[in-house]
Amino acid sequence: SSAASDVYKRQEYTEGHFLFMATKKGIVKKTPITDYANVRKTGLAAISLREDDELIEVKKTDNNQDVFLVTKYGQCIRFKETDVRKTGRTSMGVIGMNLTDGDEVIGMQMQSQGDALMIVSEKGLGKCTLISEFTTQNRGGKGVKCYKITEKTGNIVGVKAVNQDNELMLITTEGIIIRIKVSDTTLLGRITSGVKLINLDENVTVASIAKVREDKSLIDNADTSELLSEEEEKESAAIAAENAKKASVENTETDDELMKELLERAEADGSEDEEE
């Protein structure tokens, strides 16, 4: 099981809002946010996980979203949030996506976060595809192809719902970070591989991607309230890259730490939606 930390001190626990969770094995869960109003300092059970599963994403929702799950093998499913019934904190959830052998979910996005999906592969290629190209399906399906995986592209490592005025940061396993404008990328169809976004040295891959606000603070980091200097950005990228390397060998994070990070991301996403 995982534990939730009290990271919603700056927001009210509003009736009708939920925490929507996704795991790498395609399990999704929706719990009323009010269930987390009294989180103990030692944490609070948030979801029950199978031994070989882990939580990858948490979003704050209003029960009116379309949910997008994307896998490392380039599959995507879109379904209504209302297809998932609300459950208590300690429940395991339900099947959101039926995965093929070896595949796993690498990201979850909500319709309100953007009008296109920016998908990036481990070898530095990426593309934007309008969310209108993804038809709504029933929860639990296999989804549709959203990226053409080849030896040149490698597997998918990140997905973000974006608008044309957004920027993204790409972070490599060597701690290199670049910033790209979504407007500089071409809109492409679902079954394509995209274009090169970053030049990588041999044995270097993209570790993660992050969406950037106009004030240049990462929306994925709820504690970042001031602009980062170039030196601080490089240091942050190096830390993220080192963490990515460790995670590829073994799961070094505790459940408490992982849940805290994911809930912080959910808070940041919720704050952004309210600002808009």
Explain the meaning of each model-derived region.
Residues 1-8:
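Short, small-residue-biased leader/transition segments that mark boundaries at the very start
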Residues 5, 53, 91-93, 100-104, ...:
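Repeat-based blade/solenoid architectures
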Residues 13-15, 43, 84, 91-93:
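N-terminal cationic and glycine-rich segments that engage phosphates or anionic surfaces
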Residues 18-36, 47, 58-61, 66-84, ...:
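A structural feature that tracks compact, well-ordered secondary-structure segments
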Residues 38-60, 90, 98-100:
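Beta-propeller and closely related beta-pinwheel folds
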Residues 42-46, 92-97, 140-149:
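Acidic/polar low-complexity surface segments
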Residues 138-162:
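Generic long, charged, amphipathic alpha-helical segments
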Residues 210-276:
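Acidic, low-complexity intrinsically disordered tails
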